[in-house]
A protein has these predicted regions:
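Short glycine-rich anion-binding loops that position phosphate/pyrophosphate groups of nucleotides
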Residues: 10-11, 87-91, 171-172
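Conserved helicase motor
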Residues: 58-65, 140-144
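Class I SAM-dependent methyltransferase SAM-binding "motif I" and its flanking Rossmann-like core
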Residues: 95, 99-157
């Protein structure tokens, strides 16, 4: 039995996916997806000739229960391949999908992760920061006081543990995030801003907090990942 996780975001660039992935995807007719509409659009980008109406999609969101997932996996248990597609990243890596894989593993079903772009890995690669030890924290608190406290805590971990710290923000709050980082971190602390990774207009730049002052591009409408190191 095989369960294939696409390990690619449905809104990311098709050029970054190996041709092997296409072969696998075209052999799958059951998909567990974060968003049905964008998953259908993604599959059409993979192959324009694909007959979407012959495919079955199962929604994966915060309302999906373990019982739902077990039901979704019935085709897999019957010997068919299934795929997991998340919105903009790698399924099960800082993205939905881990619960599906956990249940598949419990049922002794084969899980095959496919190679694809991960903004976490690619941003570490492009930052010049420690790639041996790094931690991804997702979204930081929205409340200003809590956010400032969290940023300072992450900066302390950089110096105490020599560990790269990564986090993200909703695009329309990106500019405010950079502002908060520059206000709360030491001048010598390094900040890498990685935006639009693998897509047109890709931007990956590392500078000290002091060097970033007054020189930050507008990040308000693009996906970004922020990295701190020393």
């Amino acid at each position: 039995y095989e369960m294939t996780s696409s390990l690619v975001g449905s809104e990311m660039c098709i050029r970054d996916r190996p041709s092997y992935n296409k072969e696998i995807i075209l052999g799958i007719s059951h998909f567990i997806v974060e968003d049905v509409r964008s998953a259908r659009r993604f599959l059409k980008k993979v192959d324009r000739e694909i007959d979407i109406d012959t495919l079955t999609f199962y929604p994966l969101n915060k309302h999906t229960s373990p019982e739902d997932i077990s039901g979704y996996l019935k085709p897999l248990m019957a010997g068919l391949s299934m795929g997991v597609i998340s919105e903009a990243g790698c399924p099960a890596v800082a993205d939905p999908g881990a619960d599906v894989v956990a249940i598949a593993q419990r049922k002794n079903l084969k899980v095959v992760p496919l190679v694809g772009p991960s903004s976490i890995i690619l941003s570490v690669m492009g930052s010049g920061f420690n790639g041996q030890s790094f931690a991804f924290h997702g979204y930081l608190p929205i409340e200003p006081g809590e956010r400032a406290k969290k940023i300072r805590t992450l900066e302390q971990r950089v110096y105490a543990e020599h560990q790269t710290q990564l986090f993200i923000e909703t695009p329309y709050r990106n500019n405010k995030m950079v502002e908060d980082i520059l206000q709360n971190c030491r001048p010598q602390t390094k900040l890498c801003i990685a935006a639009n990774i693998t897509c047109e207009g890709e931007y990956i730049k590392t500078k000290t907090v002091k060097e970033w002052q007054g020189k930050v591009p507008d990040l308000s409408k693009i996906p970004c990942i922020f990295l701190l190191y020393k």
